[in-house]
A protein has these predicted regions:
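Positively charged n-region of N-terminal signal peptides that target proteins for export
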Residues: 1-4
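Sec-dependent N-terminal signal peptides
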Residues: 6-9
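N-terminal signal peptide c-region/cleavage motif recognized by signal peptidases
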Residues: 13-17
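Thiol/disulfide oxidoreductase modules built on the thioredoxin-like
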Residues: 101-108
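Histidine-centered phosphotransfer motif of kinases
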Residues: 119
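Periplasmic/extracellular electron-transfer cofactor-ligation site
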Residues: 22-79, 87-97, 123-126
Length: 126
């Protein structure tokens, strides 16, 4: 009986762990808000904003071939860690005051931010 209770508890906990990491497919839908200015995936190019391919782990303001970064973002000096990206999705102006991104609403739902992060991290064509 104890084994069944333990197994049931593990099964109930599993979805919580999976959702904390984000769902890339759901994140693709969230990314539609970003796609006005940014591209990802095979053949992505810089547009109004830089391509976000392989952004995780990259230094802020350094996408090769993109020259329209704000002085604030070029001077930020941080690496795009998961925590930095999640904070940026929520309120970019709090992460780098004076940046030029025009997305004042941010992504308010924490699950949407997790999903967006999972999607963007999946966009690193080899």
């Amino acid at each position: 009986m104890k084994k069944w209770v333990l197994a049931a508890a593990m099964l109930l906990a599993a979805p919580a762990v999976a959702s904390a990491e984000g769902d890339a497919e759901a994140g693709k839908t969230v990314f539609n808000k970003c796609a006005t200015c940014h591209q990802v995936g095979e053949g992505a190019k810089h547009a109004l904003g830089p391509s976000l391919n392989c952004i995780a782990g990259r230094k802020a303001g350094t996408a090769e071939g993109y020259a329209a970064y704000s002085e604030a973002l070029k001077a930020a000096g941080h690496e795009w860690s998961d925590d930095k990206l999640l904070a940026w999705f929520e309120a970019d102006d709090k992460v780098v005051p004076g940046n030029k991104m025009i997305f004042p609403a941010g992504v308010k739902d924490p699950a949407d931010r997790d999903n967006l992060l999972a999607f963007i991290k999946s966009q690193c064509p080899q």
